């Protein structure tokens, strides 16, 4: 796996462009298990960043609906979803290599073959590698809420990002978000509702019950015990 997780963008004069990122690089120390997984399973399941669009049929060796998960953490729920739906293809993106290693180890242990992972900036991957009208589902679960007001602009869910996701979804594809931060849920709802081309799948036009397809994480279980809420939002591409 290459170490160039984040490639700067350049202007017409070749100068690097600065753009606000929605994450902080916290690479952390790899455990021996994570290191072993990166060395041994990355060649099979890992995808290097490329400037060229990916061909999903070639990448997965078959034609099947593709779900993209952005920021899969340690990968437990992503692996569980891929194992539960072997008829679908899953691509996960995570910027922190310990999480990528943990996901690879878990996928290998569970015998999951319909999963590929990347260690790169998801926005750049969407721009450069994901073909338009190619995804059946985009998942964004528990992104950093950047709860301080001065940091709100760092939240990944902003109008340009949501419009980018829209362009990558097939007609009828769904953008599924979840957060345990109510103010961020309200922000997500406001952003998504402002974009022509999305339809809110909530009967009350706000949030949906957690679908069975999204596993409950340990983090989420702990939150429930402490009385914390979780908000799911699902928006379908309709035009």
Curated annotation (Swiss-Prot):
PROSITE patterns: SAM_MT_TRMB (PS51625)
Reactions catalysed: guanosine(46) in tRNA + S-adenosyl-L-methionine = N(7)-methylguanosine(46) in tRNA + S-adenosyl-L-homocysteine
Residues annotated for S-adenosyl-L-methionine binding in this entry: 69, 94, 121, 144
Keywords: Methyltransferase, S-adenosyl-L-methionine, Transferase, tRNA processing
Pathway involvement of the protein, from the record: tRNA modification; N(7)-methylguanine-tRNA biosynthesis
One GO molecular-function entry: tRNA (guanine(46)-N7)-methyltransferase activity
Residue positions binding substrate: 148, 180, 217-220
Region feature Interaction with RNA, mapped onto this chain: 150-155
Cellular-component GO terms for this entry: tRNA methyltransferase complex
The keyword Iron-sulfur appears for this protein: no
Domain of life: Bacteria
This protein's record includes keyword Cell cycle: no
PANTHER family for the chain: 3-DEOXY-D-MANNO-OCTULOSONIC-ACID TRANSFERASE/TRNA GUANINE-N 7 - -METHYLTRANSFERASE, PENTACOTRIPEPTIDE-REPEAT REGION OF PRORP DOMAIN-CONTAINING PROTEIN
Quaternary assembly: Monomer.
Protein name (database record): tRNA (guanine-N(7)-)-methyltransferase
Native species: Salmonella choleraesuis (strain SC-B67)
Organism ancestry: Bacteria, Pseudomonadati, Pseudomonadota, Gammaproteobacteria, Enterobacterales
Gene name, Swiss-Prot/TrEMBL: trmB
